C-alpha cells in the first residue's frame, strides 16, 4: 500500500516539488495506518482517540515546506490508495462489514487531516505572535 501511495504522490508536481527521500516521504504512513486499524477495531460508539501521529505528521510536513493544500492532497491520496486496495481485494472482504468500515476509514483519515491542520494553524498563530 505504501508503494501505491508513493506512486500517486510522485505523480503530483506540487508534492514532488518538496525534495524528500523515501523515509521522509513515507515514514509517517505506518503510524497513520496503524491508527486507522485501531479505529476499525473499536466498538461502535467508542470515543475516537486523537491521532498523535497525525499531529506530529502535520508539524513535520509544515517544517518540510508543505502548504495546507499539499497536506490535504497527500491525505486525499491516502484515502484513494486505501479504497483502491480494498477494491483490489474485494474477493477477500466481508461485504456486510465493508460499508461501515469504509465510513470509519474515511472518518479517521479526515480526523487525522484535521489534526494536521490544527498543527499548521498553531504554528501560524505562534509565528504571528512572535512578529
Q: Language-model features: where?
A:
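N-terminal low-complexity or simple alpha-helical regulatory segments
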Residues: 1-69
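Long, amphipathic alpha-helical coupling/dimerization segments that relay conformational signals between
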Residues: 48-130
Amino acid at each position: 500500500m505504501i508503494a501505491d501511495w508513493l506512486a500517486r504522490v510522485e505523480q503530483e508536481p506540487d508534492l514532488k516539488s518538496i525534495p524528500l527521500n523515501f523515509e521522509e516521504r513515507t515514514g509517517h504512513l505506518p503510524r497513520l495506518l496503524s491508527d486507522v486499524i485501531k479505529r476499525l477495531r473499536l466498538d461502535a460508539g467508542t470515543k475516537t482517540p486523537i491521532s498523535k501521529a497525525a499531529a506530529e505528521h502535520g508539524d513535520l510536513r509544515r517544517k518540510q515546506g508543505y502548504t495546507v493544500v499539499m497536506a490535504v492532497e497527500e491525505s486525499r491520496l491516502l484515502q484513494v490508495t486505501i479504497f483502491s486496495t480494498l477494491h483490489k481485494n474485494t474477493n477477500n472482504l466481508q461485504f456486510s462489514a465493508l460499508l461501515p468500515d469504509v465510513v470509519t476509514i474515511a472518518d479517521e483519515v479526515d480526523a487525522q487531516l484535521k489534526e494536521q491542520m490544527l498543527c499548521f494553524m498553531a504554528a501560524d498563530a505562534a509565528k504571528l505572535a512572535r512578529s
